[in-house]
Each structure stands twice: as structure tokens, then as C-alpha cells.
Amino acid sequence: MLPAMKTVEAEEEYAEDCPELVPIETKHQEKEENLDFIIKIPVTIVTGYLGAGKTTLLNYILTEQHNRKIAVILNEFGEGSAVEKSLAVSQGGELYEEWLELRNGCLCCSVKDNGLKAIENLMQKKGKFDYILLETTGLADPGAVASMFWVDAELGSDIYLDGIITVVDSKYGLKHLTEEKPDGLVNEATRQVALADMILINKTDLVSEEELNKLRTTIRSINGLGKVLETQRSRTHLSNILDLHAYDTLSGISLQKKLQHVSTAPHLDQSIVTVTFDVPGSAEEESLNVFIQNLLWEKNVKNKDGRCMEVIRLKGLVSIKDKPQQMIVQGIHELYELEESRVNWKDDAERACQLVFIGKNLDKDILQQLFITAVAETKEQTTAPGQDGACPPH
């Protein structure tokens, strides 16, 4: 129970304190060992700007009775150069805890490999968990952290990335999202929203409806693909948070329905926008790979102002020549994959390529024309409009 608080701010400060991990009751804690090692464990990344309510969300999840064994990775800041990170799990009424010392506040940098190995070792030593929640620092890039798990899944790991949740503070979110960095780079809060599969607009009771509408519009213009929920004190139904399956090979039908609701964002003042287009017909697989690699790897595609386009997130449903299945493409930063769905195209007349890009300096017209020019079945890959030399590294 919360102690008596004199102000809303005091209550929020208490809620943001590091949560005390509580035992999670499980009905079936004794499972067969072999089955335990077959099931892959989902990892949900919880990110958001400092003070948005990430820790409050974790505390809420940990105190709910959902019959799961949950491992929690908490990000704690220290005054010195080293940061301690706690790996803990509530299991059978006992709290197991190990410490992994970090030299900076970002899991994806100097401890990229060790961080993942620590999770796997913890799982082997203490037994399997039903779920892992990873809280990133307020200044971390969740895309790099997500890539770590995505790559490891390809290597046969027994954990997989389930989704990214970004918590946004209603009161200060607009300020954070529109803040301009002197070096011209994308600010951390905007990047976190751009990469989210689920966006929680938190503390909605502290702002007016007008302020909330401005924040909604800004968030949707940055990320037209993620789901948006509004919360107070980071509380929402657990089904909205756990088991998102955002990176699974979705059926073509479900992805097609989702893409139909995504539209190109109006050009406001945001540095990151969502762009989408639909091109009828099929694509050559090799040409499609070159098109994506030029965007994600070579970064040599420019907009009308001569600025390099930076794709942070990519998702789409495409038709590949000579393949009966609908193909799903998705990517984060420099990683992408093209996989078969479980749905076949009914006939050639319905074949099409639907793509959604989230990123910086994006130009829909140039992207669409480049796609048509470079990926058409009868075309060879050539230098297309907007592709006239490598961009400088970011």
C-alpha cells in the first residue's frame, strides 16, 4: 500500500522508485525438464524517456497475479563510472538475484554480448522463466537492444524478442519529442517512439484534452505502425503488454489488415515520420534485397533536399516473383528479414507490395519511384532518382 502523499508529484516520485520484486504465484511450477528447454522465452523491452513511468509499469506487472515466472532486468544508475544491473526472478516464493556490472548505462554497447549471455546463464542456473522484462535506460536506443535479441534468435537461442513498449510522459512528452539536438541527430525520445510496437501515453490525468490531442498527433506522425494506449500510473491490462508477438511471422492476412490502417504522416516539424505505399505486381527477390540494403546498409538514398534517408523501422507484405506465398519483410536499423507467410496469393491480379517505413528525412515519392524502378521484374538494379552517392555516417 502506498504511504500517505500530500501531492500528486510526491506519489509519482514514490511510484518511480525501484520496485520490490514480489513472488509470482504459479499453478504449474513443476514442469517436465525437456519441455522446459523446448519452449522459447519471450523478451519484452520497456523503454521511455527519464521519468515517463517505466519502473512504475514494471512494478505494476510484478504485483499482478498472472501465474507466470518473470525475470526482470532493472536498469539502475550510479554516481560512478560503473552501473549495477540486477537480474532477478520471483520463483516459488524465493528471490534469486545475480549482479552484472555495466561500465555505462546502455546495454547495447560495451556489454552487448555479455548481457545476453548473462540472461541465458541465469535461465540455465535457476531454471526457465515464462517471461523476461528488460528495462532500458532513459537515454538508450531500444533498436540496438532489440537487434541483439533478434540476431541471437537466428542463432537458435531459447529466448526471442516479443516486442518493444515505449512509455511517454503526457506532461513533458511533447517537449521531449520536439527537442532539437545541436548535432542534427534524432533525439532519444523520438527514436524510442519510432521503434515501439506499443506506445503507452502515461499520466493522462495531468494534462488537458487539448494538450493530449497534440501529443497524440505527434506520436502518430512519428510512428503510424505501433499501437497507442493511454494510461494513468502506467496501468493497463496485461494482455496489452505481454505476448505482443510483434516479430513473429504473422499470417499475410493479419498483416495486410494492419497495414491498411497505416497512412503516410503529414509533414509536420517532426524529424521522424511514417511513410507507406502500395505498388501492384510482384518484385524480383534479389532486386528487393538490393533496394532494402541500399536503404539500411549503404544509406545512399537521398530526399529532394539532398538529405540522406535514415530508415529506423521497416515492415511490409510483398509479392515475390515465382513464389506462391505472401512474403513478410521487416527490419530494425541495419537488420532485416524476408520470410514466407502461411498465406498464398489467390491469383496474379491481387499480387502487390505494401511497405511501411519509419525514419528520418523520408520522402514517399522518391521511395516509391525508387522501388518501382529498382525492383520491377524486368528491371536491373541501376542508380535511381535520389540515389547518387553514399551518405556520411551517422
Curated annotation (Swiss-Prot):
One of its GO terms (cellular component) is nucleus. Its EC number is 3.6.5.-. InterPro entries: CobW-likC_sf, CobW-like_C, CobW/HypB/UreG_nucleotide-bd, P-loop_NTPase, Zinc-reg_GTPase_activator. Keywords: Chaperone, GTP-binding, Hydrolase, Metal-binding, Nucleotide-binding, Nucleus, Zinc. The keyword Zinc applies. SUPFAM superfamilies: Hypothetical protein YjiA, C-terminal domain (SSF90002), P-loop containing nucleoside triphosphate hydrolases (SSF52540). It catalyses: GTP + H2O = GDP + phosphate + H(+). GO terms for biological process: intracellular zinc ion homeostasis; kidney development; protein maturation. The keyword Chaperone applies. It is found in: Nucleus. Zn(2+) binds at C106, C108, C109. GO terms for molecular function: GTP binding; GTPase activity; metal ion binding; zinc chaperone activity. It comes from the Eukaryota. GTP binds at residues 48-55, 109-113, 202-205. A motif (psi-PxLVp motif) lies at residues 16-23. A motif (CXCC motif) lies at residues 106-109. Residues 272-375 form the CobW C-terminal domain. Belongs to the SIMIBI class G3E GTPase family. ZNG1 subfamily. Zinc chaperone that directly transfers zinc cofactor to target metalloproteins, thereby activating them. Catalyzes zinc insertion into the active site of methionine aminopeptidase METAP1, which function to cleave the initiator methionine from polypeptides during or after protein translation. Mechanistically, the N-terminal psi-PxLVp motif binds to the C6H2-type zinc finger of inactive form of METAP1. PANTHER family: COBW-RELATED (PTHR13748), ZINC-REGULATED GTPASE METALLOPROTEIN ACTIVATOR 1A-RELATED (PTHR13748:SF31). This is Zinc-regulated GTPase metalloprotein activator 1.
